[in-house]
Amino acid sequence: MTANDLWIPRSKRLKRPYQPRYNRDCFGELIQIDGSYHDWFEGRAAKCCLLVYIDDATGKLLHLRFCEAETTFDYMLSTRAYIEQYGKPLAFYSDKHSVFRVNQKSSQDSQITQFGRILNELNIDIIFANSPQAKGRVERANRTLQDRLIKEMRLEGISSIAEANAWLPCFIEHFNQKFAKCARNSKNLHRPLTESDAELEDIFTWQEPRKVTKNLTITYDKCIYLLEPTELNHKLAGQY
């Protein structure tokens, strides 16, 4: 097959060129998000993950948060803090991590992740990058942070996630003064956050649809839960 050019060995295939993507024009139009797992404290604490939110148009760091791992709950906390500070961007730009996208489909799985559901309820789009090169701004920021942020935390004597998270707003301010640039268009495309605190509490919770049986029970995680036989709960029988 190789001799007849029906199959080309991987080592001899032409490398796919990754063409540059122009940055967006407006602040808040596209926010790149990523998690960077690294020895951030140089052995003074366990390896952990830094969640990074960076504006595509300006290169501004908008949110940083250390956490033990790149989980849905940590992205929930970071995203809520972000939108409460800046409002709702038009879109987030991420890789295809399982937090953002269902990668293994089955008949029992939802076709949307918890994080995807949250963004859908907030009317925020999410765009998936097909390669690390496609989200170059946040990848470059990660490399810069793995150098500059580590050195500054060493000088500050910071040795824990809690200490680092309390100090990060100061670092973000100085970082943006040095590295951020002006957008081509001065318009801010963040939309006001109109949801109440109670509505946000409901949106930023883990939600799983379950059917209420005629016996007023629901099943979740191999456990059966009994609902109180109230008039309201009787009306829920047969519903999700």
Give, region by region, the residue ranges found by the protein language model:
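Mobile genetic element proteins and their domesticated derivatives, centered on retroelements
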Residues: 1, 34, 53, 59, ...
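Basic, flexible linker segments flanking DNA-binding modules
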Residues: 1-33, 38-39, 104, 110-113, ...
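An active-site-proximal beta-strand-loop segment
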Residues: 33-62, 72
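Short, solvent-exposed loop/turn segments at secondary-structure boundaries
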Residues: 44, 65-66, 103-108
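Active-site beta-loop-alpha junctions of metal-dependent nucleic acid enzymes
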Residues: 46, 64-91
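Acidic/histidine-rich, metal-coordinating catalytic segments
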Residues: 83-108, 132, 188
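Charged alpha-helix within mobile-element recombinases
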Residues: 108, 114-184, 189-201
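C-terminal, beta-rich DNA-binding module of retroviral/retroelements integrases
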Residues: 172-240
